[in-house]
Amino acid sequence: MEAVPRMPMIWLDLKEAGDFHFQPAVKKFVLKNYGENPEAYNEELKKLELLRQNAVRVPRDFEGCSVLRKYLGQLHYLQSRVPMGSGQEAAVPVTWTEIFSGKSVAHEDIKYEQACILYNLGALHSMLGAMDKRVSEEGMKVSCTHFQCAAGAFAYLREHFPQAYSVDMSRQILTLNVNLMLGQAQECLLEKSMLDNRKSFLVARISAQVVDYYKEACRALENPDTASLLGRIQKDWKKLVQMKIYYFAAVAHLHMGKQAEEQQKFGERVAYFQSALDKLNEAIKLAKGQPDTVQDALRFTMDVIGGKYNSAKKDNDFIYHEAVPALDTLQPVKGAPLVKPLPVNPTDPAVTGPDIFAKLVPMAAHEASSLYSEEKAKLLREMMAKIEDKNEVLDQFMDSMQLDPETVDNLDAYSHIPPQLMEKCAALSVRPDTVRNLVQSMQVLSGVFTDVEASLKDIRDLLEEDELLEQKFQEAVGQAGAISITSKAELAEVRREWAKYMEVHEKASFTNSELHRAMNLHVGNLRLLSGPLDQVRAALPTPALSPEDKAVLQNLKRILAKVQEMRDQRVSLEQQLRELIQKDDITASLVTTDHSEMKKLFEEQLKKYDQLKVYLEQNLAAQDRVLCALTEANVQYAAVRRVLSDLDQKWNSTLQTLVASYEAYEDLMKKSQEGRDFYADLESKVAALLERTQSTCQAREAARQQLLDRELKKKPPPRPTAPKPLLPRREESEAVEAGDPPEELRSLPPDMVAGPRLPDTFLGSATPLHFPPSPFPSSTGPGPHYLSGPLPPGTYSGPTQLIQPRAPGPHAMPVAPGPALYPAPAYTPELGLVPRSSPQHGVVSSPYVGVGPAPPVAGLPSAPPPQFSGPELAMAVRPATTTVDSIQAPIPSHTAPRPNPTPAPPPPCFPVPPPQPLPTPYTYPAGAKQPIPAQHHFSSGIPAGFPAPRIGPQPQPHPQPHPSQAFGPQPPQQPLPLQHPHLFPPQAPGLLPPQSPYPYAPQPGVLGQPPPPLHTQLYPGPAQDPLPAHSGALPFPSPGPPQPPHPPLAYGPAPSTRPMGPQAAPLTIRGPSSAGQSTPSPHLVPSPAPSPGPGPVPPRPPAAEPPPCLRRGAAAADLLSSSPESQHGGTQSPGGGQPLLQPTKVDAAEGRRPQALRLIERDPYEHPERLRQLQQELEAFRGQLGDVGALDTVWRELQDAQEHDARGRSIAIARCYSLKNRHQDVMPYDSNRVVLRSGKDDYINASCVEGLSPYCPPLVATQAPLPGTAADFWLMVHEQKVSVIVMLVSEAEMEKQKVARYFPTERGQPMVHGALSLALSSVRSTETHVERVLSLQFRDQSLKRSLVHLHFPTWPELGLPDSPSNLLRFIQEVHAHYLHQRPLHTPIIVHCSSGVGRTGAFALLYAAVQEVEAGNGIPELPQLVRRMRQQRKHMLQEKLHLRFCYEAVVRHVEQVLQRHGVPPPCKPLASASISQKNHLPQDSQDLVLGGDVPISSIQATIAKLSIRPPGGLESPVASLPGPAEPPGLPPASLPESTPIPSSSPPPLSSPLPEAPQPKEEPPVPEAPSSGPPSSSLELLASLTPEAFSLDSSLRGKQRMSKHNFLQAHNGQGLRATRPSDDPLSLLDPLWTLNKT
């Protein structure tokens, strides 16, 4: 039925308009009632007249409907201002023609005009609805709408204009028109439903409703009054309507029959089809004389219904045989009205347009507007009262809490150095000699001070001596021999001058001491400020909050943010309410509203504020809940608040102290200069006085001698008597003996400097002064001295007692007093030789060892050891200094000493109470720097009779820094390892001498001095199983704060030509880590002895003055010349001295290197809570990714931030080299660009990108090299010591020559760029990238460096990679290669074509992946992007890249979760299997052949590489440093097969007890490696004690063990045939001596 031809529709004619002269009446009313000039409204009246002309001659289209509606609205506006209704003041006659009769009808009422316009509006809509053919869906909809609008217009006219102005607008005619229009609209809807094949039952109901509407219209047409009014058209309409009633009834029953057929009610189906056929036949009868369209529709329908009826009847007759019910018994079809009259709103502004008479506002409208304003004000006052009450409560609550959201969580402020301190550090960094200048100035001042004091003492001594001589003279001669008055007066004048100068000196001495105290107070801080920034940062206090405390803090922050959010929302809502009320003006509505409906209008208008009121009330109600939560959070925050408050005080105090030290520097320098000037003047005066005193005293002595001679001639010769020996004052001898203090001690006040004292005669049990003090305080003996100076290296004719430098002991600590039974000491004096020294040969002294007290054995009574006093033995010194060509340092030489005298045996011990449990070190803390003599070669005269002590690590009492000391606390002392183990093997079962954490660091002024001899007790050991002792580089505490470590120097003992005992292998002791404290290296060989118990961590050392050093390159250029014989046990030159390694100077740039990459020690996701947290973060992160608007906002914020940041950074240098920039808008900032040190100019378009993550290496982001900048690129690779280059350029770009090939592509075809030549070593292609190993050689140097070039070719220039998985896999490959290099702070070079787009995305993803792998969760990507862009503009150039990075992070986190057994939330992507291969590319610094590396780096690297791989571990993580061995490992837990590195075999001539044989362990299978076949790293890794072998397959050779070394073998030594497979077999061990 959807194709049935359309039935014709009924439409109405338009009424014709007559005259309406409204202008004169309106003008008259405006003049009279409004008091305005009516001519001012001529324009408005003309507009209204023009609008009426258009309305009465309306076009027959949709535009005509708009004109009619607009005119209707303007008439409504005019009526509300000028009363023109029936009987009103401004009424004028209105004339229109009546349709049916054609007569003109006039009324003096503007409402008649409005009614006629409404009628024409309905008629025009009926015309437009009937004109459409309704063959399309759109046509059916338009016709349906027009008929509904027509029905609306007629219905509005019928209801709002009750007076029948004319016959065609009578109520009966309007009702007829409404029903006709609704029926035709429903008919259009029926046609649309049949076209859409709606359900049969629904179509039947729609059709039945059409029948209902037409029946209503038919009843109106049959009304006699209506029939008489309509005239001729009544018959035509009635026939058409009746025919349609039967027709649509037939259609309704047809679809009811279809419904029965669907329900398989075949009898009902026949009944409905029968009824439809009957009604259709009735319609055909009534259709006679109708147009062809009606006939066509009836015929079509007859075909459909007839066919359906015949088919149904046959089916029922022959198949179903159901009874056919009567139609009356079937359910009647109820109509479904789906159309309605569309209402007319005459004052709709969208239809009427602007009010033409808007300027005319009646007074009544103003009054109503004021009433409405009062209603609005009442509403506002009510809401503001509630808001103010709540705000007052909130303010009082927050004031009482004293919680400022800005300062509650200022933990970030403690993580970096504050700006004011950074300014001070920067000011000191450009003045590196600040501390040195201050110390030197104070040293000069101290020197002059000491000279003045010495001169004054000399004057005093001369005067006292003169007085003594005068007394003797008087005794001998009497008053008769008085000296001249002039001489006495002159002497008195000298005394007065001396007293005056002494008084001035004493006053200045106090000032000088204060100045030194101030200097000592500030110099440490100044050293700290001028040192590395990480040390400054470490000196500032840091918050120590537990995770629970941080959670409390975060909770409080969250609630405070809620409070602020609530406040902001409240202010915003209040502002919205005020603005809405202020803008709300309904005057125009009031003008057109009747006075009786004002109240109703107010209520409707005030409803618009209901939504805002609801929001405000919800906000106010939430305040109580938020404050309750804030109270609970504040209670939990109390403890954290106290911690943060204390931290803030400490932070501010430390900050003020450091700033005050900086500000005091200039004042100290000024005062120091004033002191120097003062003392220089005083010195000259005192020197003059000293000369005068000497001359005066000499003159007096001469005079006395003359008188004495004269008197002696008179007297008989006396009996010979011996005069009383003079006892010189101790201070005098000290002043003579002390000499100049060392350089570091000259800056100390004079009252703190004392020379070594001569011993008094032994009295009872007093401790002789020439013995070192006891390690623990005693009630007897002298108190500890803070400092003592060593003997100056001059020639002394000393006393017979042995003078030994005092070493300061620890600060005095109380010891429980008790009775002690001490025997009297015994000693054997012996006349000593006078040692001599020369500038090249220091005094080779051998102070008696063992003079200190032996440590008490736990549980045994202790007594002081036997004191031994004797002369210091001096060695005969060779007059020559031997030098070797390859060693640029003098080699001191000397001969062996005489045997030491045999000390007395220990006296018997008596029980004494044990001291307090405060163990002290057996070695003496070195308070001042001692002159370091050369190595000793003792002869075989060994004293006997001393038991060997049990030496173990002794805890050091924690020292407290003294205000007047210029040095920090001493590091804990360790027992000294044996220097000559063949003389005195110590008795130490189960213990080996531990190694100190501090290496010996050379001090200024003692360059090139070897370390002091390692003295141990000269005790022969009892017959136990001794472990072979070891000797090595001994760490010595320096006299100041511990110095930052220079590269540790390996000192081995110089063996004599004929060894007397076991030779000690050199032992390299690693220095502390760069963080300033001793950190154990990961995976080291277990220590030979347990480490001492943990003590307090020493304060961070200030940076020391660097001694004059060799350049780094000079040391590295001749690495193997550093005495390989001394390190590998080869023979030495006859000079016998050990060559000294000069410390290498690190460049300033190298000093600023970032800290090494932080390694991921273990899997952070072993804990389930970490996994759960990661899952939650992933869900939140997915939400961000799914929100396109949020990503757009983030991108806009990043762009704005970049513009803001770029304004504060300069690119002036880059602009000068425009030819070296690929794009003129991509240039590096001046502050962090890479500077070329050895090129023609220092510019390259490359930026250092650091600080993205502690687990991500530093990166150098650069553009792809241009043809003219490839040499600069490789020069940067060489200078930065880069080992890994990442290239993110597609093959298409290289084929189109957008990017030049700057690397060799064929083996055997090297490429030269400037001074560098490149060669391709190997190429390997994988499914994600191309890996090239290149070798880089600089000019004519023979050394080559290897580096890895990783090319990711599947990232197009203007797109994205194929999948995030490939890029993630590539990043893991890059990181794996990076971890194989050493050291771990060299950067990775990353470039695409421009160096910002793909490079930025790679860097961002690299950092994010490392953060996730380290267990830190998903980082804030926008923060990382901004951090990158602060270092290089335009990093991450496209928003597409940002979205890709978000997706890649999601993919990586899913992989991490899958790795730990957490299934993905949706269908996972293709799992990118991470190929974990042990790639071992050649290291950038060839550690075996040397390269540009100091020997310390080689040693440190070998130590780092000494890792035993666990069995069966195949992932690359096995090669990473892991957690260190626990420090307290007992010796029993050492692997028995691990050889102790420091042990040495006993000599062949010295039989020793056999060591137990080590148990053989099964060999550990090596993890398979797919890296290159050999590299320097592999070789170095094989040099560790665990893994050393000359061939990886062992080739069937016997494994060497300790037992092999203990057995004697007859061989040719160095002339033995070397195995051909030894990679070092071709090295000549004597090559340094054969070079010439």
Swiss-Prot record:
Annotated coiled-coil segments of the chain: 550-623
First-listed, main subcellular location of the protein, grouped into a coarse class: nucleus
Biased composition (Low complexity): 1567-1587
Impact when changing P829L: In NEDBASS; uncertain significance
Family per similarity comment: Belongs to the protein-tyrosine phosphatase family. Non-receptor class subfamily.
Protein name: Tyrosine-protein phosphatase non-receptor type 23
Region annotation His: where it falls in the sequence: 770-1130
Phosphoserine PTM sites in chain numbering: S733, S1122, S1123
Alphabetical list of PANTHER family matching this protein: PCD6 INTERACTING PROTEIN-RELATED (PTHR23030), TYROSINE-PROTEIN PHOSPHATASE NON-RECEPTOR TYPE 23 (PTHR23030:SF30)
Pro residues composition bias: residue spans: 898-922, 950-962, 983-1002, 1036-1050, 1083-1109, 1523-1533, 1542-1556
Modified residues (Phosphothreonine): T1131
Extent of the TPR repeats: 250-283, 374-407
Oligomeric and partner information: Interacts with GRAP2 and GRB2. Interacts with UBAP1. Interacts with CHMP4B.
Catalytic residues of the enzyme: C1392 (phosphocysteine intermediate)
Omega-N-methylarginine, modified sites: R950, R1615
BP terms from Gene Ontology: cilium assembly; early endosome to late endosome transport; endocytic recycling; negative regulation of epithelial cell migration; positive regulation of adherens junction organization; positive regulation of early endosome to late endosome transport; positive regulation of homophilic cell adhesion; positive regulation of Wnt protein secretion
Limits of the Tyrosine-protein phosphatase domain: 1192-1452
Location of the BRO1 domain: 8-394
Disease: Neurodevelopmental disorder and structural brain anomalies with or without seizures and spasticity: An autosomal recessive disorder characterized by global developmental delay, brain abnormalities, mainly ventriculomegaly and/or brain atrophy, intellectual disability, absent speech, peripheral spasticity, and microcephaly. Additional variable features include early-onset seizures, optic atrophy, and dysmorphic facial features. Early death may occur.
Each Sequence repeat, start to end: 953-954, 955-956, 957-958, 959-960, 961-962, 963-964
Source organism per UniProt: Homo sapiens (Human)
Top-tier EC class: hydrolase
